[in-house]
Amino acid sequence: MAKEIFFSDEARNKLYEGVKKLNDAVKVTMGPRGRNVLIQKSFGAPTITKDGVSVAKEVELKDSLENMGASLVREVASKTADQAGDGTTTATVLAHAIFKEGLRNITAGANPIEVKRGMDKACEAIVAELKKLSREVKDKKEIAQVATISANSDEKIGNLIADAMEKVGKDGVITVEEAKSINDELNVVEGMQFDRGYLSPYFITNTEKMTAELQNPFILLFDKKIANLKDLLPILEQIQKTGKPLLIIAEDIEGEALATLVVNKLRGVLNISAVKAPGFGDRRKAMLEDIAILTGGEVISEELGRTLESASIQDLGQASSVIIDKDNTTIVNGAGEKANINARINQIKAQIAETSSDYDREKLQERLAKLSGGVAVIKVGAATETEMKEKKDRVDDALSATKAAVEEGIVIGGGAALIKAKSKISLNLQGDEAIGAAIVERALRAPLRQIAENAGFDAGVVVNTVENSKEENTGFDAAKGEYVNMLESGIIDPVKVERVALLNAVSVASMLLTTEATISEIKEDKPAMPDMSGMGGMGGMGGMM
């Protein structure tokens, strides 16, 4: 296929057109009075959204060169969402502002490489200043405020996330699911839960809830299959003497071993239940070890020279209760020593820091949460499927932003933190490097300008007022149209969101500004299908039956 090549200003201007179109679609969603964007789908109802990254992902332009520019900034929006959970619109608006301002200077004769160097230095200084301006999230109220802003000013979602985080802790797992009703719900599972249910319905003790519930049980952990009853008999006899319930967690339990457990349960000889161990392979062994540490027991493992026959009461874990349904097992208040649990938590945290695999990291974080905080499930309700999807996206965004706030701290929101950070830096740069720094500094006004514009206010006046204010925490509340103390009004952003948005915006803008040639495919129009009307009645085929 033939290729089209553009050089210098012509190439950059084409790229800019694509960036501008993407920015124009995304920027309208910014701020408390941002507008909706309606997106056509190839099937089903159109999507209505105020989520910047959802809009950016849908922008696909006809002109291949414009599309190259748009796709680079689209990647920045997605990357910002992945790293910080929010700030996609901020990153897009900043990237556009930096590219636009830089293009003007480079067209006027500035050296792109020197300009890039100045931009990088300014970005570094502003990020350092943002970190100085940040402070820790102090309480549940501030968590709710961060979540509310990220959920497009939905206080109910903000409070729901704050409740979830309060109950499971900052390391706890919070998942978002679709509810089967129109109401939002928060369900918290205290203790460790894993996705394995009872091996036989005969183990059920609560027929109303269809669950097997064991109070103060012993917990036997074995890393192989149990099929032979002879191996299991010694420990069962010891358990019977204590009169306590028993939970067996093993790779699998089958044959006569499972049949005997069921018969003993039905006859009332033993209150017993059995489940498969969670995970697979090495991960299963690690999770069994986690359960052992949580419950104060030991994993009976043939690799360590132990057999099931040799197991004694001292090897068993304990918990205040265990609840098992057909899909999940929940161990509440394991009897493990706090020091051992904390050591295991620190070990998993170290593994998370070292791993380069996203999948492994996710699984390690799940294990960490099971040990340290428990699990909270936010169920999002809505009247229609379209509303449900849009709301679930907002809850996901708000949850990620809240975790970012807890991780790195908060700064004043509404685009004001970037302007305050800009006023505090002093870079002694010369020539085109100074121009590069000035480009970034001017672009930092863009988010606040856009928020004010979307709310229907004079953007120039708003930016000047905030910039010239002597009060460090003063910003513009676009929802009310007032200049307020942003911290006191609860208008705050995670510093990680601001930092990542700026770094990614400068990165893509400087890459676009230093582009000197572009190569793209020439889209050829496919010839139309020939007109069939002149082919007559195909009368010669009349003899076919």
Curated annotation (Swiss-Prot):
Localisation per UniProt entry: Cytoplasm
An annotated GO cellular component: cytoplasm
Presence of keyword Cell membrane: no
SUPFAM superfamilies assigned: GroEL apical domain-like, GroEL equatorial domain-like, GroEL-intermediate domain like
InterPro entries registered for this protein in UniProt: Chaperonin_Cpn60_CS (IPR018370), Cpn60/GroEL (IPR001844), Cpn60/GroEL/TCP-1 (IPR002423), GroEL-like_apical_dom_sf (IPR027409), GROEL-like_equatorial_sf (IPR027413), TCP-1-like_intermed_sf (IPR027410)
Statement: the UniProt record of this protein carries the keyword Chloroplast: no
A Pfam family that the UniProt record links to this protein: Cpn60_TCP1
EC number: 5.6.1.7
Class of enzymatic activity (EC top level): isomerase
Catalytically driven reaction(s): ATP + H2O + a folded polypeptide = ADP + phosphate + an unfolded polypeptide
Single GO BP term: protein refolding
Keywords: ATP-binding, Chaperone, Cytoplasm, Isomerase, Nucleotide-binding
Gene Ontology molecular function terms on file: ATP binding; ATP-dependent protein folding chaperone; isomerase activity; unfolded protein binding
Binding site for ATP: 29-32, 50, 86-90, 414, 477-479, 493
Family matches, as PANTHER family: 60 KDA HEAT SHOCK PROTEIN, MITOCHONDRIAL (PTHR45633)
Function: Together with its co-chaperonin GroES, plays an essential role in assisting protein folding. The GroEL-GroES system forms a nano-cage that allows encapsulation of the non-native substrate proteins and provides a physical environment optimized to promote and accelerate protein folding.
Subunit structure: Forms a cylinder of 14 subunits composed of two heptameric rings stacked back-to-back. Interacts with the co-chaperonin GroES.
Family named by the database record: Belongs to the chaperonin (HSP60) family.
Protein name, per record: Chaperonin GroEL
Species of origin: Campylobacter lari (strain RM2100 / D67 / ATCC BAA-1060)
